[in-house]
A protein has these predicted regions:
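Short, structured "edge-of-domain" segments at secondary-structure transitions
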Residues: 1-297
Length: 297
């Protein structure tokens, strides 16, 4: 429909489960067999046919689950600067007629991203003012579905969290984008790696007038295709995005109109055996964890 945004497409089986994450910190669990079959370019079935959801609550991410019995986490990030990881098996539900809490958000906060993460991966954080850093996924304690998580980043006065996502240490570069569609790539080794939470380093030159507002980050390989809609579909190879040092500004390899959107796709959770020597329990004492994090860094 006009004004709607495509989250992603993927192949699936009727025995799979689709988890949908929303801006208000909720999630819906939909068995694929409950989704109506349709033809190519059909508008499709509205979520309200199977799940009650507020019309103002917008879907941000989709994750396809083949099996909840896997050694992986779903990580959620809020605009209030919190981050949470919860084992995939905690997201399985018996009833799915309404949305459920995916993250306990504070007043005026939104959930800005939800994604799958695996052992030994890294989490990348970036603030709107352009500070960024990486840390190990193990730095986030596993907590329950309804917790608010822990502090993701130390922020300067007037700054706020823009984005958080997963990456691998061997990823060659990270793409950063601003609210007006400007972009740059930075070698991964230039992005500081440390313990959560920290402020990080600037990944762009700060201008006194019309400073850049960072809104998005993504690990990329040179041959990867980036698909944008503004509302026309535009495709750009990651290699066409300027590869610049941290101290430089952003480039404009593509002219994007207001309201542009980067196609994210649907995450498919891999099935990984849970190690027998690993404690995969969640911690519910989130307030104590959060207070402890405030003293770090």
């Amino acid at each position: 429909k006009d004004g709607d945004v495509l989250i992603g497409t993927t192949e699936c089986d009727t025995l799979d489960t689709l988890l949908l994450f929303t801006s208000k910190g909720n999630y819906a669990s939909i068995p694929v067999w409950q989704i109506d079959e349709g033809k190519w370019k059909d508008v499709g079935m509205h979520l309200n046919k199977v799940v009650r959801i507020d019309g103002e609550d917008k879907i941000k991410n989709a994750i396809l689950i083949k099996s909840f019995d896997t050694y992986a986490w779903i990580v959620t990030v809020s605009s209030a600067g919190q981050i949470k990881k919860t084992p995939v098996n905690n997201w399985q539900v018996d009833r799915n007629n309404k949305v459920m809490t995916a993250m306990n958000l504070g007043k005026d906060a939104e959930m800005i991203n939800a994604f799958i993460a695996y052992s030994n991966q890294q989490i990348l954080m970036v603030s709107k003012d352009g500070y960024s850093y990486r840390f190990a996924i193990e730095d986030i304690p596993a907590t329950g579905v309804k917790s608010k998580g822990v502090k993701a980043m130390n922020l300067g006065k007037g700054d706020s969290l823009a984005w958080g996502c997963v990456m691998n240490a061997e990823d060659p570069a990270v793409l950063y984008m601003t609210n007006v569609g400007q972009m740059k790539r930075i070698h991964t080794e230039e992005i500081v790696f440390g313990n959560r939470p920290m402020k990080g380093n600037l990944i762009c030159k700060r201008l006194k007038t019309n400073p850049s507002i960072v809104t998005l980050a993504k690990a990329v390989s040179a041959g990867e295709e980036l698909i944008f809609k503004d509302p026309e579909r535009q495709v750009l190879r990651a290699s066409e995005v300027p590869l610049k040092p941290r101290e430089s500004g952003f480039g404009s390899p593509l002219v994007l109109k207001d309201g542009w959107n980067l196609y994210r796709g649907i995450d498919e959770c891999r099935i990984i055996d849970i190690p027998t020597d690993v404690d995969n329990e969640v911690h519910e004492d989130v307030e104590r964890l959060s207070l402890f994090d405030e003293k770090e860094g």
